[in-house]
Amino acid sequence: MTVDTVTGPTARTGGEQAPPAAYPRPARRFLGLGSGQIVAVQLALVLLVGAMAAGVGYLLPAVPLAAALVVLAWGRWRGRWLSEWTAVYLRYRGRRRRIEPSGDAAELLAAAAPGSRLSTLDIEGVSCATFTDAEGMCVLLELGDQAVMPARGWHPLPSPATLLPAPGADTPPVRLQLLLHANAANGSSPAASSYRQLSGGRLLANERAVLAVRVQRAEGWQEADLQRALTGAVRKVRAKLGDVPHRLLGDVAALRALAEAAGHDGTSPAQEGWSALHIGGLYASSYAVERWPTPHPDPAHALLPRLLRLPATTVSVSLTAGPWADGGTTLQAELTVRLTAPDHTSLGNAGTALRQLLANEHAHARRLDGQQFDGLTATLPLAGPGPAALGAGGRGGVNRRPAAVAALATPYGGSGLMIGVNRHSEPVSFRLFRPEATRLVMIGGVAVAQILAVRAMALGAYVLVQTTRPWAWEPFSRGLGSGAPLAVMAPGPVNVPPGTPLRPLLSIVDAGPVAADRTPGTPWHSTLVVRDDLSPVDVDVLGRADLALLQPLQPAEAAVAVSVLGLSRDQEAWLSRAQPGMIGVVHRRSVRWAALSTTGYEQQLINATQQNGR
């Protein structure tokens, strides 16, 4: 397979106009048939009639040639016309299928949306990133509470069909895209298996929901008009979101969201194959859901959350709605799923699980063979053309009833690291790793810190321990075995690679009283300060922590915690009277209590450490 190197345009930041659209024009169809199919039959008939008129000898080559034309035009394979497969193959062979490494998302953006540029737009007093290309203009909103411990564990996200502004003669077409991206922590290490046993597979390592709002170019609409229309569309969408937490993304955050959704680490090239795309060290396959599931009245049977929990390294689900069609009675909608895995075997198993899940819901998906880069583009938060519009024929999304699209609402919030269970036997979790730096303080000793380290490894993290008591950590390190993502060293400056969603970084500081870290930190990097007890010297570091983990305290310690964390006197009493094995998770002046659950694997590691430490 020959590969062309990407040397084309990168993302522009100026005010230059976008070039003409590079996307294929929709093909005209009659009764579901392409015009090329009808022309092929006509050519075959003309060929046969001409051969008969010329003489019997001309029929010998004319008959197989005419038959080949008919078979090519009317033959079907794997649910598509052979002529469509031919067009897909020719387009696959004729385009660039490689994205070069880049320190930012510029090269990725240039490949996904040719001729695009990044600028900013002021919407309701907030400067947000705007992606402008030949299709139109787009802004991004991140949905969901991004706090380390959200106020609500679960909350529903509306379908883009319910958020789509009503059609109007004085507004350009609008398309919305809800992109869900999740890492299910499906590793094969002992730590990952232990954590799945603890959580029952209910919690994702991390998840992200991004809503893209796009206004499409229309005849007579100038750039300034599109900006005003986009501002109005975003205002209407935000009003419909109501109490759903959301924020507009600026330029840096938007580019980071784009790169993280693609899984492009910027250190290695991305290469498209026929059935899979190799990007960020993983293999990815995209699927277009062509027959949608029957809506289920029970939210527990919602399809989208179950898609996010497929046995893959990451899962991306894109649901688009719009523009309106048929006078506002239907709308174009597409559902695309992208799976990633470390090897082809695991990727095939994930694809089989996807098909089985959809079959149980009387739905069907088609793998985008020859269109894997189209699948990647469709699962980026750009609300651009989907695989149907980009592929052979350029047919665009299927027109569906708004109620059918609105039924695909999704519960959101089931991600994080599980610390234990509450009195209702429900998991208590918090987001140890986020797209921003996270600082934690744990009062209670090394054992709980080691449990957190094991569970962080299960989420894919690399753990760096800086300690003044190596004898407490070396038996733990030996118990994990060689090759474990753990390093134990003395306190001091250290250079570490930046964290990523799939490989976050946890720094554990077990060095007695320390000063609070006042640096801004980096995304996907969390710092856990471990203290055996709480004293006035810990006030600064505790007051600046995003989250505090408190085991039962002495009355004097509880008084310090209440003063620093802004807790009530009733909470102070609970902090000093809690039973052994309980842990309080403190965030934003609230305390959630959990029974510290441990697995057999974790108990084995901790017991070995305690025995060797005597």
Where are these regions (language model features)?
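Structural motif
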Residues: 145, 340-342, 442-446, 466-470, ...
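Extended, compositionally biased accessory segments flanking or bridging domains
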Residues: 127-131, 377-482, 588-614
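N-terminal alpha-helical membrane-insertion module
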Residues: 1-104, 426, 546-549, 568, ...
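Extended, folded cores of ATP/NTP-driven motor/assembly subunits in large transport
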Residues: 2-19, 60-404, 448, 454, ...
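Conserved ATP-driven motor cores of ASCE-family P-loop NTPases powering translocation/secretion/packaging/pilus
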Residues: 477, 531-600
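Conserved nucleotide-sensing/catalytic segment adjacent to the nucleotide-binding pocket
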Residues: 479-532
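Short, well-ordered alpha-helix to beta-strand connector turns
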Residues: 460, 503-505, 523-525, 542-547
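Substrate-engagement module of ASCE P-loop NTPases
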Residues: 162-166, 513-542, 554-555
